[in-house]
Structures are given as structure tokens and as C-alpha cells.
Amino acid sequence: MTDNATILQHVPVGKKVGIAFSGGLDTSAALLWMKQKGAEPYAYTANLGQPDEDDYDAIPKKAEQYGAVKARLIDCRLQLALEGIAAIQCGAFHISTGGVPYFNTTPLGRAVTGTMLVTAMKEDDVNIWGDGSTYKGNDIERFYRYGLLTNPNLKIYKPWLDQNFIDELGGRAEMSQFLIDNGFDYKMSKEKAYSTDSNMLGATHEAKDLEYLNAGIKIRDPIIGVAFWKEEVEIKPEEVTVRFEEGVPVALNGQRFDNPVELILEANRIGGRHGLGMSDQIENRIIEAKSRGIYEAPGMALLHIAYERLVTGIHNEDTIEQYRINGLRLGRLLYQGRWFDSQALMLRETAQRWVAKAITGEVTLELRRGNDYTIMNTESPNLTYEAERLTMEKGDSMFTPMDRIGQLTMRNLDITDTRAKLGIYTDAGLLSIGQGSAVPQLDNKKK
């Protein structure tokens, strides 16, 4: 490995090394191990509003106990909320099953963490970064991209890519014993049947038992929502009104929120009471291998449903089509760790300017269990939907029966062309005409 290598495979002795520190077993053992091997560890913890984290202030103190030269808590919640709203505005969600999307909550969290922690490291003149991502997953590439995008001089050192670390502390039991042997009363928590990663926007559950497709959502304990599949869990129908102004969610049930963080947390509470936004997805990782995840995102789901209702009531068909196509492409870029790449910024600007700016109004929904809901009302000064335009009742109309006759007559041109093409395909043996064919009602007579 040359001195110019970006990825370091051995402990950088005598060098400052920043580590994304969660306070869990892996990063605690890694920090102490690096310290003992001669590195100068600096710990950086991102406050992403994780629903399963009770005491953020205690995490940097723990890092210092394990040997961190300096430990900092970086509040990333506002930036994460803004990026989440941007994803809603752009429809940046490319993974879905049965119409229920995955809201890319982990990729959004990585975009914020990767840039904000490396920025904090630069302030401390720390130019080597490590995190807990494994070589088989998506995060190792996401953090790599965002880290180098933020600091072009950054070097990467991950203990989990260092064979010496793997040989000495290759598993949870070894890491726990290592901490105990060094005087830390670390009690290894009981392993769950799956792994969970979360932030304010949502939670991801994957790996272990969830790698097997015969293990479903029911083995998992929700951390944002409720187990709506359990009959004993009482969930009463609830109406909720969501208000947008120029594409930005500003109010829930008439209560305005100046802080987007507070709005998303309240949306989580409302949607979470019903288990809204939970999904089970099979997806393609960046390396093209398939993986399976179960996701929670009640607040994102609530905002997405209301936003798309206004989109369909305000914009024309071609704009909606382009919004959806661009959203699929942008969602994939986000998933790949390219949220701040030029091609992503181009797609984001298009949606946020020409789609989102027109989205002002209120949508009222009735939430029931899981993703079962009904849209009760839609109001907006910008609606192009007008019931009177296509009313089935007798009255004034914007066009007459004769107008429609003329419009239909013009269709004769392309119908004739289509019929001719089908004849060509039939003659070429690509189509068969008659019973059981793709076009059974057509004959092969040319008229």
C-alpha cells in the first residue's frame, strides 16, 4: 500500500484518527484498541434524533473514558429534517413493493452524517476517518463518497478492514471481553434477531434472522410505530390534516411548526400511533447484490401521502410524469451516496422549483391500521381540479358534443397507423391473430 493510498489498512500510529462514535460495543472497542495501538482517537457523535437513544450527552463522555483525545456531539437534526423534506418534494424514493415505498431514510442520514462529521473533523485538523460500516454493505461507499467530497485530503482507516483488528477482536464476545479486561464493566446486551439503524426520519431493520424471507415483519419490535399486526394493540381511526406552503410542510392539525425538526417528530408521533409507513422490501445494494430490509417511517409516509395528493390535484399529467421519473432516478442516486453530486442537484432543483413551489394547501386523512388510510378532503388555491369541468350533470360545459366528435375523428389517423403496424408484425410472425393471441379481437383483413 503506497503513502498516497486513500484507504489505510493498518493503524496510523501517532496520527489523529476521527471515529464516528455511537457508544455501542463496536465503536467502543475500536476506539480503545486504536488508542492502545498508538493512534490518537477523536470521537464524533451525530445527534440524528434517533428514537432509540435516550441520552446523547453521555456518549462523548463515554468516548473520553475509552481514551478519546477529544469527543464532540454534533447536532445534525435540522440538516436531516431539511434533507428529508427535500426528498419528499422530489419524490426521491425508488424502492417500493405494492405501491408502498422505502423512504431512503438511512441514505439521507448518511448524507448528513458523512458531511457534517467530516466538517467537524476538519475544524480539529483531523484528516483520517473511521466508521463502523462493513465491506459488504452500502454505507462503506456512502461514507467514502461524502467524506472525500467534504475533505479531499481525507484518509480512511476502518478497524473492520484491518486484519490485525479482526484477528484480535473479530466478534462481539471478543470485543466485550477486551473491554472487561481493560477495566471497563461492559455488559454485552442480548443480541436481537435482527440489526437496527435509525434516525429521526425512520428506522431500518435488517440482517440476521431477517435475511431469511420466511421471517417477516412480525419478529420485529417497532421503535417509532406500533405493532399494528397484533390484534390486542388498540388503534382507533384518527383524522389528521397536513398543510403545505410552497412545498414545505408547515402545520399538522392546525398547529404551525417553525422548526422542521419538531414538525417531523410530531408527524412521527401521529403516524406512529397507527404503524403508518412500515414496509418490507427486497432491494439491490450498490454492489448489485440483493438484500432485504424492514422499514419504519411514519412521519415521512404521512407527509409523502399529503404532498402527492396535492401534486396530482395541482400539476398537469406531463409534469407529474416527469416528477415521478426524476424521483426514481434521484432516489437511486441518493441510495448510492450521490445526493450532493451535480446530476442529483440538477434533478432536485427541477422538482423543488417547478413542482414544489406550487404545492400550497391542506390534505385531511383518516389513518387506521398500518398503511390503511382514506383521504377525506383536499383544499388548495392552486388546484386545477374543478368538479364542474367534467360534471355528469346537465349544465354549462367548456366543450360540446360536436367538439368531442371532432377530437375523436382526428384519432382515426393514429388508429389506422396502429392497425397497419399490427399487420406488419403479423406478417413477420411476431403476432398471431385470433383466439389466445395478444390481440384476439382483430382479424387480418386489411380494410
Curated annotation (Swiss-Prot):
Organism: Acinetobacter baumannii (strain ATCC 17978 / DSM 105126 / CIP 53.77 / LMG 1025 / NCDC KC755 / 5377)
PANTHER family: ARGININOSUCCINATE SYNTHASE
Official protein name in the record: Argininosuccinate synthase
Binding site for ATP: A20, F21, S22, G23, G24, L25, D26, T27, S28, A46, G132, T134, D139, D197
Pathway: Amino-acid biosynthesis; L-arginine biosynthesis; L-arginine from L-ornithine and carbamoyl phosphate: step 2/3
Enzyme category, top tier: ligase
Reactions catalysed according to its record: L-citrulline + L-aspartate + ATP = 2-(N(omega)-L-arginino)succinate + AMP + diphosphate + H(+)
CC per GO annotation: cytoplasm
Sites where the protein binds L-citrulline: Y102, N138, R142, S195, T204, E206, E283
Any one GO BP annotation for this protein: L-arginine biosynthetic process
Predominant cellular place of this UniProt entry's protein: cytoplasm
Top-rank taxon: Bacteria
EC code(s) of this entry: 6.3.4.5
Subcellular location: Cytoplasm
Phosphoprotein is among the record's keywords: no
Family membership noted in the UniProt record: Belongs to the argininosuccinate synthase family. Type 2 subfamily.
Lineage: Bacteria, Pseudomonadati, Pseudomonadota, Gammaproteobacteria, Moraxellales
Keyword Signal applies: no
Keywords, ordered alphabetically: Amino-acid biosynthesis, Arginine biosynthesis, ATP-binding, Cytoplasm, Ligase, Nucleotide-binding
